[in-house]
Amino acid sequence: MKISICGKGGCGKSSITTLLAKEFAKKGHNVLVIDGDESNLSLHKLLGMDLPKDFIEYLGGRKEFMKKLREKMDGKEVELFEGEISIDSLPKEYLVEKDNIKLLAIGKIHDFGEGCACPMGALLREFLKSLKLKDKEVVIVDTEAGIEHFGRGVEGGCDVIIAIIDPTYESIRLSKKIEEIGEKLGKKVYFIVNKVDDETKDLILENVNKDKVIAVIPNNKEIMKCGLMGEELNAELSEIKDVVEILTK
């Protein structure tokens, strides 16, 4: 199963990605977490890992990868990856692993003027389409904020889309767009309502498709502290356990 975690900036995508990854691993799954956000500097910290090397460098860097991709789109026989890709076949020097969870970072913006993130989005799209999973393997993609990754076709390689909704008008509006696009793609779309109290929970549930909501997560001091300090997140939430049960039915 390949899961895309999406939503507006600051809604809690990285925290939910971390909590889901750890719960899937506890249930005996082999988990690959993909950091698909070129601006994200906290996901690896929440997982308690070092930041891996940029995977796009394995393919020659941004310019070389885009050159190969353009040649492929022009009809030339170009292999972006050598043979079939599986989690076990990924180059270990581009992975960090802990407690049955592997972390892969597609690529980051490191310097002024180095160019846009389009090559990283294209690589993530092609990688997800090419990655073949075995039984009990799960991929969780922490996407960049917003919906540009939908325009790049990233979710075409995923089975499930989970939109994280926080107590903001923007987040509610975005969830409706994600639901619309995801259903046109024929993907399963779910919502996780995050960072709420009783009042904001009710307001959100009145304004989204409640049938898509698989968890409502209240404000949590441990999650907030880990996110603020860049510390490993080990919170155990019954809501996350329920999400994993739903996804593995």
UniProtKB/Swiss-Prot annotation:
GO CC, alphabetical: cytoplasmic side of plasma membrane; cytosol
Signal peptide range in chain numbering: none
Pfam families hit by this protein: CbiA (PF01656)
Keywords of this entry: ATP-binding, Nucleotide-binding
Superkingdom: Archaea
CDD domains hit by this protein: CooC1
Positions that bind ATP: 7-14
GO molecular function, one term: ATP hydrolysis activity
Disulfide bonds: none
Listed name of the protein: Uncharacterized ATP-binding protein MJ0084
